Amino acid sequence: FLSMYLNLIFVQNGYGKYCMDMEVNDISAIRYPCPRYIELPRKPLEDRLTAEDKQLLLQAFVRNKDELEHQIEESNKVGDKILILTDPVCTLDVREQIFRDIIKMYEKEGTIFLKPHPRDLLDYQKLFVEYPQFDASMPMEMLNFFPNLRFKKVVTIFTEVKGLPFADEAVRLGPDFMDAYEDPLIHRQNEQI
């Protein structure tokens, strides 16, 4: 009541006064759904796009499209690709260590690509210069539109990665992984409600 109607306290996941609804691709993938979630799968929208539409979207959202297409082509010659999706967790120094550890866990399996989260303020371009990177402002769904782009694995901490058409396997490390890096009370908020 205090958050939904009076806006006196902040509670995440759509319980705020100004949230009318939250569109999600698949409600079943959410462990603690909010009554304001509305399931609206993106697949029917995507299926209507032509090849030209997809290229136009890539041009609009991907700043370094030509460079990335070249890196994708080169990595296709070498072998498997691993995509690591970052999350805006912890302090910046701890976050850097987290993603260095994740890279170390998966770099033997293929060429590492990074896709920073839009709210992630860590400077991956500077700190992880040796890895190809997708722009943080680019929606993850744009990866569906790169021709010949296939990842052996997509790895993330908290981002939902169920059913990604450009990945053979999705790995969501989750709160158990994060327990090693910060107090569990910080990232297990939904479990406390």
Predicted regions and their residues:
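Catalytic donor nucleotide-activated moiety binding site of glycosyltransferases and closely related
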Residues: 107-136
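Active-site donor-nucleotide binding/catalytic segment of nucleotide-sugar enzymes
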Residues: 23, 30-101, 110-120
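Active-site and donor-binding regions of nucleotide-sugar-utilizing enzymes
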Residues: 1-27, 145-149, 160-163
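Short, charged/polar "capping" segments at the starts of alpha-helices
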Residues: 91-94, 120-126, 178-182
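Short acidic-hydrophobic, aromatic-tinged amphipathic segments that line or gate anion-handling sites
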Residues: 39, 131-141, 171-173, 187-193
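A donor-sugar binding/catalytic signature common to diverse glycosyltransferases
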Residues: 142-186
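Structural motif
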Residues: 12, 20-22, 85-90, 115-118, ...
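Well-ordered, non-membrane alpha-helical segments in soluble/globular domains
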Residues: 1-4, 93-106, 136-142
